[in-house]
C-alpha cells in the first residue's frame, strides 16, 4: 500500500518553537487592542469577538474586556478558534509589512521538495489557523512553499490531542490510515494519530524533549519514504 501522504505538525516540527513564542505571540498581544478597535465591525472579526464572549461566559464583555481575555489566552497558549483566527489576521499584516518572515527549518524545505518530487501529498495540521499556516509557508525564510502543500488543517478539524481529529483528516483526504504518516514533536498528538490508525514518527529536535514509543528522527533529512 505504502505512504501516499505526510501530515506535519508545525511548531517544533517544521518551525522553531521560539519563533512562535518569541516573535509571533508577542506581536499579536501588542497588536490586538488597535486591531480590534479598528476592525470590530468587520464581520469575521465581529464573529470572533462574539465567540470569545461565549467561550469566556462573559456575554456582556466590552471590547476592552474581550481584548484582555484574548491577550490572557495568548499567555496561556489557549487553542481557542476565535483567538487563532484573529492571530492569523494580525500576522497577515505583520508579514505584509515585512515585520518578520516565517521561520522554517532548512531540512524541511529540502524535504518538502523531495516529497513533492515523489508525488507524495503534504498537509500541515496546527492549532494555528489555516490562514496563519498559509502565511507561515508563503512568507518563509526559504520563499513561498505553499504550492508544495495539498492542504492545511486547524482546530476546526478537531483538537490535536483527539483521535477524532485525525479520523476527520483521513476522511477529508480520502486515504486509508496506513497510507498517511503523521510527523510531530508532541507525544500526545502522536498517540491520538496512532489511535486513528495513522503511521507516526516523532520529530526530536531537542535532546531534552520527552519521547514515546515511536520511531524518532532529529531532522527531515532522516525521513526517507520508499
Curated annotation (Swiss-Prot):
Cofactor note: Binds 1 Mg(2+) ion per subunit.
Family annotation (Pfam families): Hydrolase
Function recorded in the entry: Bifunctional enzyme that catalyzes the enolization of 2,3-diketo-5-methylthiopentyl-1-phosphate (DK-MTP-1-P) into the intermediate 2-hydroxy-3-keto-5-methylthiopentenyl-1-phosphate (HK-MTPenyl-1-P), which is then dephosphorylated to form the acireductone 1,2-dihydroxy-3-keto-5-methylthiopentene (DHK-MTPene).
Magnesium keyword on record: yes
BP terms from Gene Ontology: L-methionine salvage from methylthioadenosine
Cofactor: Mg(2+)
Database matches in HAMAP family: Salvage_MtnC (MF_01681)
Alphabetical UniProt keywords: Amino-acid biosynthesis, Hydrolase, Magnesium, Metal-binding, Methionine biosynthesis
PANTHER family reported for this sequence: ENOLASE-PHOSPHATASE E1
Superkingdom, taxonomy of origin: Bacteria
Reaction(s) catalysed (UniProt annotation): 5-methylsulfanyl-2,3-dioxopentyl phosphate + H2O = 1,2-dihydroxy-5-(methylsulfanyl)pent-1-en-3-one + phosphate
EC number: 3.1.3.77
Complexes and interactors: Monomer.
Species of origin: Shewanella sp. (strain MR-4)
Gene Ontology molecular functions: 2,3-diketo-5-methylthiopentyl-1-phosphate enolase activity; 2-hydroxy-3-keto-5-methylthiopentenyl-1-phosphate phosphatase activity; acireductone synthase activity; magnesium ion binding
Record gene name: mtnC
Pathway: Amino-acid biosynthesis; L-methionine biosynthesis via salvage pathway; L-methionine from S-methyl-5-thio-alpha-D-ribose 1-phosphate: step 3/6; Amino-acid biosynthesis; L-methionine biosynthesis via salvage pathway; L-methionine from S-methyl-5-thio-alpha-D-ribose 1-phosphate: step 4/6
Name of the molecule in the record: Enolase-phosphatase E1
Disulfide bonds: none
Similarity field: Belongs to the HAD-like hydrolase superfamily. MasA/MtnC family.
